[in-house]
Swiss-Prot record:
Keywords: Aminoacyl-tRNA synthetase, ATP-binding, Cytoplasm, Ligase, Magnesium, Metal-binding, Nucleotide-binding, Protein biosynthesis. The keyword Ligase applies. It catalyses: tRNA(Phe) + L-phenylalanine + ATP = L-phenylalanyl-tRNA(Phe) + AMP + diphosphate + H(+). Its EC number is 6.1.1.20. One of its GO terms (molecular function) is ATP binding. The lineage of its organism: Bacteria, Bacillati, Cyanobacteriota, Cyanophyceae, Synechococcales. Gene3D superfamilies: Bira Bifunctional Protein, Domain 2. Binds 2 magnesium ions per tetramer. This is Phenylalanine--tRNA ligase alpha subunit.
Length: 345
């Protein structure tokens, strides 16, 4: 590193006000020249100390001001402070210049070939439940159904009463349903979407209603208080159980492939007759769907002539279909966000 010229002041050099002013002027000129010629941050730091430090030239002048008269001290003090502020500004500007010069040199030395392919960010993938639900929707859309949705916070009327679920039905029990107040609740199925749709759209109707539903189930390997459901509704003239059976079998064969399927008689308040659908899984029968012919009372409450129009409804849980498809034995794995599990799909 090159030597930096210095300008020092001693007490013996001070004889009069004019001498001090001359020394300050010379100091300012010499310091400016040294700052402009400083080529490194280290040189700048040494200049800062020699000029503005406790033992620097300006500090020496300020210390000997006591030897001057009361009238002279303000003159010297004002000039010294002006020079101090000016030198601080020069030092900071030169520091910024050195930083910019270093950055320019770095940019010149570190050229980037923009034609080189980047490493890229690993792409994400759909959650297995989303993929399963999308596949279910695609199958029914291929059968001529359209997708409808509705609110997750429902009224007692749409969730229960309009679906022929009586006041004393166990599903209305607070142990099974999340009530927000006396008349509002978190929907326990997506069937209310069907009612809302039929209120505004006369038959014929072919819709599916996917979405989240809520039930007060204890969390275990096969139950969750929040899960995904897809409801199916078909209303048309001369619809009978064979249409229901054919639709369900077509859907299950398309989704699972050649797998044993059976229908069992069951009961649901909003369908009559009703059935549950089982498939073979790990050597046992596993329920995967509930279905049935729409109860005429449900249609009549909506002002639909049940003598002219008939239909069927079916419902399924997306989680269960995904578990059967991928041989997953615990529903909780879907909600832990464990990448070791999710990256398998």
């Amino acid at each position: 590193m090159k030597a930096i010229p210095t300008f020092t002041i001693s007490v013996r050099q001070i004889e009069s006000l004019s001498q001090i002013e001359e020394k300050l002027n010379n100091l300012s000129l010499t310091a400016k020249n040294n700052i402009d010629n400083a080529s490194t941050h280290e040189e700048l730091d040494k200049l800062r100390v020699s000029l503005l430090g406790k033992k620097g030239d300006l500090s020496i002048i300020l210390k000997i001001m006591g030897q001057l008269s009361a009238a002279e001290r303000p003159i010297v003090g004002q000039k010294a402070n002006f020079i101090k502020i000016n030198l601080q500004d020069l030092l900071n500007k030169r520091k910024n210049q050195l930083n910019n010069e270093a950055l320019d040199q770095q940019i010149k030395n570190e050229k980037i070939d923009v034609t080189i392919p980047s490493i890229g960010t690993p792409p994400g993938s759909k959650h297995p439940l989303i993929s399963t639900q999308d596949e279910i929707i695609d199958i029914f859309c291929g059968l001529g159904y359209t997708v409808e949705s509705g609110p997750e916070i429902e009224s007692d009327f749409y969730n229960f009463e309009s679906l022929n679920i009586p006041k004393n039905h166990p599903a209305r029990d607070m142990q099974d349903t999340f009530y927000l107040d006396e008349n509002r609740l978190l929907r326990t199925h997506t069937s209310p979407v069907q009612i809302r749709y039929l209120e505004k759209n006369p038959p014929p109707v072919r819709i599916i209603a996917p979405g989240r539903v809520y039930r007060r189930d204890a969390v275990d390997a096969t139950h969750s208080p929040v899960f995904n459901q897809v409801e199916v509704l078909c209303i048309d003239q001369d619809i009978n159980f064979s249409h229901l059976r054919g639709t369900v079998l077509t859907f299950l064969k398309t989704f699972f492939g050649d797998i044993p399927v059976r229908f069992r008689a069951s009961y649901f308040p909003f369908t009559e007759p009703s059935a549950e659908v089982d498939v073979q899984w790990k050597g046992k029968w596993l329920e995967v769907m509930g279905c049935g012919m729409v109860d005429p009372k449900v249609l009549e409450k909506l002002g639909i002539d049940s003598e002219k129009w008939t239909g069927f409804a079916a419902g399924l849980g997306v989680e269960r279909f995904c578990m059967v498809r991928h041989q997953i034995d615990d529903i909780r794995k879907f909600y832990t966000n464990d990448l070791r599990f999710l990256e398998q799909f």
